[in-house]
């Protein structure tokens, strides 16, 4: 099966004299997988996600996403690649409060050169799919946490990315909103979206994972399929 992510001997050191924060690590993620990354604080989860997202560069090794070795791209090329191929969802939404829901969602498409009409059509399609069309002209500050996270997911998907990265997407939500976002991630995976999810929430991990890796001190301590670490 096609590999969306390939990490080849990847290590990241923040202190040249200390142990790596991550790795060395060799890991592949196949198209359509929902990979959940768990582990204690400081285990390397955020470092792994940042390397895959191209938000940081490895000290050693190769990071290949959607067939491109992103650790060797220039900053300009990397930013363009990220906009086109990687969608990201964070704990605190990162929406622009002075833009409407529709404008927030279609902005990444416009940044990649998509025409306004086509971007608006894609935003409308996603709002319908995610159950937020009634909020099209609203501003994010008027929405609940769960609704804002749905807007963030729609924005992440607007360019039809090969990969969706989610970092503690329910961490700032109440229980009901968290369940809504969990169900949304499950539905996206069932529709074939490749997902990498970092979470401390065992229930979220169990619901979403087709595969789970558990990190300890920057290394994979456990790699399991069709079940989550509890």
Feature-to-residue mapping (PLM):
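ABC-family P-loop ATPase nucleotide-binding domain
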Residues: 1-11, 222-230
């Amino acid at each position: 099966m096609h590999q969306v992510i390939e990490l080849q001997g990847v290590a990241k050191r923040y202190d040249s004299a200390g142990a790596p924060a991550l790795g060395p690590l060799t890991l592949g993620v196949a198209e359509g997988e929902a990979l959940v990354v768990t582990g204690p604080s400081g285990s390397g989860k955020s470092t792994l996600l940042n390397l895959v997202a191209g938000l940081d560069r490895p000290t050693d090794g190769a990071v290949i996403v959607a067939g491109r070795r992103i650790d060797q791209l220039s900053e300009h090329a990397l930013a363009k690649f990220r906009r086109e191929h990687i969608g990201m969802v964070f704990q605190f939404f990162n929406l622009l409060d002075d833009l409407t829901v529709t404008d927030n969602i279609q902005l990444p498409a416009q940044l990649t050169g998509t025409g306004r009409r086509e971007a608006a059509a894609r935003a409308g399609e996603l709002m319908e799919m995610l159950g937020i069309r009634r909020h099209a002209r609203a501003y994010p500050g008027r929405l609940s946490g769960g609704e804002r996270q749905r807007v963030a997911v729609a924005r992440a998907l607007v360019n039809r990315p090969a990969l969706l990265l989610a970092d503690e997407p329910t961490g700032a939500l109440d229980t009901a909103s968290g369940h809504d976002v969990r169900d949304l991630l499950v539905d996206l995976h069932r529709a074939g979206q490749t997902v990498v999810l970092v979470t401390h929430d065992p229930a979220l991990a169990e619901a979403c994972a087709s595969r789970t890796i558990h990190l300890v001190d920057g290394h994979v301590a456990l790699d399991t399929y069709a079940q989550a670490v509890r």
